[in-house]
Amino acid sequence: MLIRKIEVFLRHTGMPATKFGRLAARDPRLVTDLRNGRTPRVRTERRVEHFMNTFREGPHAY
């Protein structure tokens, strides 16, 4: 599930959920909505996964 991957990412990076949503999907409520049962679209899921993968590879990687 995407939310589990996001939760791990947030714990490792210390990034606030709203900042993550804004950067990953242009939606500051993304993480809160996913925690409350929202099902992301395939495109959103790909965008979020891409964000997490490229963030890990960048100079700010954890």
Which ranges hold each PLM region?
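Residue-level detection of the helix-turn-helix DNA-binding "recognition helix"
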Residues: 25, 36, 53
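Short basic helix-loop element that most often maps to the first helix and adjoining turn
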Residues: 4-19
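Short N-terminal micro-motifs specific to bacterial/archaeal maturation
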Residues: 11-12, 21, 36-39
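A short, Lys/Arg-enriched interface patch at domain edges and termini
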Residues: 50-62
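Short alpha-helical DNA-recognition segment
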Residues: 15-30
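Short, basic-rich loop-to-helix N-cap that marks the start of a DNA-contacting helix
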Residues: 32-49
